[in-house]
Amino acid sequence: MQQLNPSEISEIIKGRIEKLDVTSQARNEGTVVSVSDGIVRIHGLADVMYGEMIEFPGGVYGMALNLEQDSVGAVVLGAYTSLAEGMSAKCTGRILEVPVGKELLGRVVDALGNPVDGKGPLNNTETDAVEKVAPGVIWRKSVDQPVQTGYKAVDAMIPVGRGQRELIIGDRQIGKTALAIDAIINQKDSGIFCVYVAIGQKQSTIANVVRKLEENGALANTIIVAASASESAALQFLAPYSGCTMGEYFRDRGEDALIVYDDLSKQAVAYRQISLLLRRPPGREAYPGDVFYLHSRLLERASRVSEEYVEKFTNGAVTGKTGSLTALPIIETQAGDVSAFVPTNVISITDGQIFLESAMFNSGIRPAVNAGVSVSRVGGAAQTKIIKKLSGGIRTALAQYRELAAFAQFASDLDEATRKQLEHGQRVTELMKQKQYAPMSIADMSLSLYAAERGFLTDVEIAKVGSFEQAMIAYFNRDHADLMAKINVKGDFNDEIDAGLKAGIEKFKATQTW
């Protein structure tokens, strides 16, 4: 039998120890106690942070949302069918980050920033945190530049400025998404980058939005973040924050961006689902107590930031430029009930709302914007000069028309002044109608508003107002292209432009019969 020399054994062990490559990882590890409905309870994670990424076997990740005395409640990001009780769970020491940058433009990604459009991987290296603190008051600048939506009813009566939060609210199927998509289409030549976040939508609806943006040449400067109805509640809850981070990339570098959240009602429902599964106490309408904070911390990130902020953020690479992120959140109401919990929350957070009404939509007034209830709290300062000058009487005319129309139903004979006011209101209502996917330029809009404001529609039949407007715009773009170009570039209103518009409309009406 061979004798083992103790000194040889110690030399072999010493050699093995020297060759051993140990990269130490101080990682806190726990055990999965239960898995149900995308919620995982973990025992033994002592040093985990709120919102920290937790790694499970097989490359599955979760996010810690409940830090309890004896366990941690985490939500799984993605499929959870491979997870089982007794598996290990490790802290990563990282918070959730998503890819950002111009490489994402023209792409469709999920809530975690993974491409889902079949166009290959993203060629970017930059990532940023999903949850970020909004810029402080010192770094903000007042809103004084417009975001043209291309809709007469919005740009004339409820103007939106760069850095504003303007809520689009209304019942289902009355054109909320159409309004937002048209606003994105109108930005294709404005230099504003767009982000469209689809939350809880049907995949066919998202595919249709992508196709429409592509057809209208707006997909190239748009990022689409899709968390469809088939995705887990966790991804629907995270999608708006991911989209906001992608939009902030442009804002922080002195660019302008527009983000649409379609819609935040579904995000609130997803968050309610997560909270109830985490056994958090329910409040009004079974929503958790922090549902207001859910939306306020998201919408406060939309802002206009100062030159100093951009310069500080870019370490002096960009100077003298302000950045902005404009938000158009969408909220779906039930039977026009704007006093429900989530609608009132978002109304109080935003800088105004565009209220779409079912009755108007069903009577053929599209976009179905109710000018009486809709308001823009800060957009007036950002409105283009010519639009501001010409749209003053439009809102008043519509409000008075609504009031008079209600009384006129009961009165058989009306005096001349009331009848004229009613007819003017009807013509303005007709003028505010607009087809989908046909946003208007500033010059086209100014021309229509000028015709209404200066009484050029008085002798036009109410049913022919739309045809008159189209023919007039076509005539001006053909015969007065210089004037239209000047309005589009400068947006000013002076005596020269006033005289040019007046002479042009008079000449147009002299050659046509309406």
From Swiss-Prot:
This is ATP synthase subunit alpha. ATP binds at residues 170-177. It is a peripheral membrane protein. HAMAP family: ATP_synth_alpha_bact. The gene is atpA. It comes from the Bacteria. The record marks 374 as: Required for activity. The lineage of its organism: Bacteria, Pseudomonadati, Pseudomonadota, Gammaproteobacteria, Pseudomonadales. It comes from Pseudomonas fluorescens (strain ATCC BAA-477 / NRRL B-23932 / Pf-5). F-type ATPases have 2 components, CF(1) - the catalytic core - and CF(0) - the membrane proton channel. CF(1) has five subunits: alpha(3), beta(3), gamma(1), delta(1), epsilon(1). CF(0) has three main subunits: a(1), b(2) and c(9-12). The alpha and beta chains form an alternating ring which encloses part of the gamma chain. CF(1) is attached to CF(0) by a central stalk formed by the gamma and epsilon chains, while a peripheral stalk is formed by the delta and b chains. It is found in: Cell inner membrane.
